[in-house]
Structure formats: C-alpha cells, structure tokens
C-alpha cells in the first residue's frame, strides 16, 4: 500500500470526476425534462406520466440497500467498486437511449408499460453505477486532503455536466427534430449524451486505482446501523435538506419548462433573442454564427408565426445556462467567503438567498 500522504496525479483526479459528470447527464435530464418529455413528446397523460415516474423511484428505494451489499461483497482484480463502473457503462448507454425513444403505433397501455420498464431499468443502472462510484473515493486514497481535492474535481465536473444538459439539450432536440418530429430529436440528442456518458465512464475506470482495502471483519447489523442514524441529528438535518433540495429542483425544472413552452409570451422571448442576433431574421452578422447554428441556438420561424418555432427551447436553455453560470461563480467564491465570514454564515446566507429566489421565480 502507498503512503497515505501520497499525492494523487492530476489525471486521476480529473478522471475520477468524469463518472459523476456522466451520471448527471441522466440525473439532470430527469430533473429538467423527463416529465415534459412523457407528456409533450411521448404522448402520456399527466397522471400516467406521474405513475411512470413514481414506480421506479419506489423500486430505487428498495434496490439501493441491496446494491450497497452487492458492491461491498464484490472482489475482483480491479477492486470492489471500479468494476461496477465498467460493467454498467454499456447497458447504461443503451437504456439511456431507449428511455427517450418513442415507439410508433403503440397503444397507450403499451407506451405506459414501455416507459415504466425503461425508466426502471435506467434507475436500476444508475444505482448500480453511482453507489459504487460514491464509495470509490474512499478507497483511492486515505489522505483527507487528497479526498477533499477529489470532491472538488467531482463538483466541478458535475456543474459542467449540468451546464451542458441544461443549456444544450432542448436546442439540439429542436435542431434534430428538423421542425416537426421532436421524437426523433430526442432520440438523436440522447444518443449523443449516451455516447459521451460511455466515454466518461471508461475514462474513470481506466484512470483510477483502488489503493485502500476496506476493513471486512467489522460486524454490524442493518438494524443497529439504522438506529444509530436516527440518533445522529446532523445526519437527519442533512438528509432533510438534501430531500427538499432535490424536490425543489424537480418542481422547478418541470415548472420552468411548462411556463416557457405553454404560458410565456413567445413574441417577447423572440424580440429579446432577436436583440442578441439569435433569430433567422437578425440583421447582424455574428462572428460565431455557424457555431450558433451548429448547437441549435438559432430561432427558426417568423415573428408572426411562432407556434412551432424553437423560441421557447432556446430561451429556456439560456435561462438554465445563466443559472448554472451563477452557481459555478458562487462555488469559486465560496472558499474565500467561508474564510472571511465562516462556513455556517455563508451556508445560511446562501440558503436564504436561494429561498428568496425560489419565491421570486413564481411571483
């Protein structure tokens, strides 16, 4: 075993973060777009879509502890946790595409069954991949400073993935839909994301090493572990905070999509985007016009007829990019703010500002 103070190479830290970036291509797509994909593209009713989303989450709550036991009892020449990243990479990519593919000519019942099965498979693969990955950092190094750096790299990668998913998914869907078939647009876009996920998972597998062998002779019962957790008040607070945080993310993602696509003034959005040269009728010639067209950020359609245009897709994506950019900026400023004002003060202030912003969005 290496000395605990050994520094990890940059490549390994960056490679470690790649798998979490890949996981967020699925996670953020679910948070921001999955409900609306099922209702607006796949053709399910709102109640059917809700059921399709509910059952895999309930299954996930049952499967996660099972996956934890499986990962802990895995022993291969690659280690305990790295193999799961390799084993799930290919199936993850395939199911990711299938989950956003709309079969043609199927009855509503068959579509509901297909959506439920593919979504459940995707959630299962997510757990099989992400739970071992979450434990991987603890066996790469025992140096607390190096673990902190690993988490920093991981956090940066997550925000980059969120930036890409939130900012480019809808414009690419509209681009590949070619003005009419959003089912095809979603399938092509998710194929691109799936291939990227596959590459990122392989990067993590081939650039990391498990150096620390977990202690295997510790005896504990699940019942006692759970009882200990319930007595741990900081853990309970963090659990509730995380629960509400992700609930808000889910509500906000679906609500913003619905607002911009079904309620917001499309002419007002068009005029604002036209001022930035992002419409077909913009008089200005942009240096990066070809790139804007390539990523789907050019609004198609005339101002007088925006019913089938991609104006809402582009506007929604710009809002997502703006929000993620602010998040990344705050992350970069957080260490200096924490040193000056203290971690608790900065955290409480951040939560308060986030609450105010959440209310302001729906004012």
Positions of predicted regions on the chain:
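Membrane-embedded alpha-helical bundles of multi-pass transporters/translocases
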Residues: 2-363
């Amino acid at each position: 075993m290496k000395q605990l103070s050994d520094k990890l190479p940059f490549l390994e830290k960056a490679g470690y973060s790649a798998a979490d970036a890949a996981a967020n291509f699925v996670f953020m797509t679910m948070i921001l777009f999955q409900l609306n994909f099922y209702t607006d593209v796949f053709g399910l009713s709102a109640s059917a879509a809700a059921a399709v989303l509910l059952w895999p989450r309930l299954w996930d709550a049952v499967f996660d502890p099972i996956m934890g036991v499986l990962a802990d009892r895995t022993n291969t020449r690659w280690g305990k946790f790295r193999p799961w990243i390799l084993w799930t990479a290919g199936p993850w990519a395939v199911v990711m595409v299938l989950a956003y593919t709309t079969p043609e000519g199927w009855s509503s019942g068959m579509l509901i069954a297909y959506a439920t099965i593919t979504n459940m498979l995707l959630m299962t693969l997510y757990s099989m991949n992400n739970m071992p990955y979450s434990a991987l950092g603890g066996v790469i190094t025992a140096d607390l400073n190096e673990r902190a750096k690993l988490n920093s790299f991981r956090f940066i990668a997550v925000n980059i993935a969120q930036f890409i998913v939130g900012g480019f998914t809808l414009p690419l869907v509209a681009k590949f839909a070619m003005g009419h078939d959003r089912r095809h647009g979603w399938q092509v876009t998710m194929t691109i994301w799936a291939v990227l996920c596959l590459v990122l998972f392989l990067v993590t597998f081939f650039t990391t090493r498990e150096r620390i062998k977990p202690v295997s002779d510790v005896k504990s019962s699940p019942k006692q572990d759970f009882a200990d957790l319930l007595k741990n008040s900081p853990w309970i607070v963090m659990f509730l905070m995380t629960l509400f945080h992700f609930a808000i993310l889910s509500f906000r993602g679906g609500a913003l999509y619905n607002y911009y696509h079904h309620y917001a003034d499309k002419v007002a959005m068009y005029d604002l985007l036209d001022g930035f040269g992002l419409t077909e009728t913009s008089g200005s010639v942009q240096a990066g016009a070809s790139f804007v067209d390539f990523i789907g950020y050019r609004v198609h359609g005339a101002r007088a007829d925006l019913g089938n245009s991609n104006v809402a897709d582009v506007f929604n994506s710009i809002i997502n990019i703006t929000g993620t950019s602010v998040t990344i900026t705050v992350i970069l400023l957080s260490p200096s703010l924490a040193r000056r004002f203290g971690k608790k003060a900065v955290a409480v202030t951040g939560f308060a500002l986030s609450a105010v912003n959440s209310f302001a969005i729906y004012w």
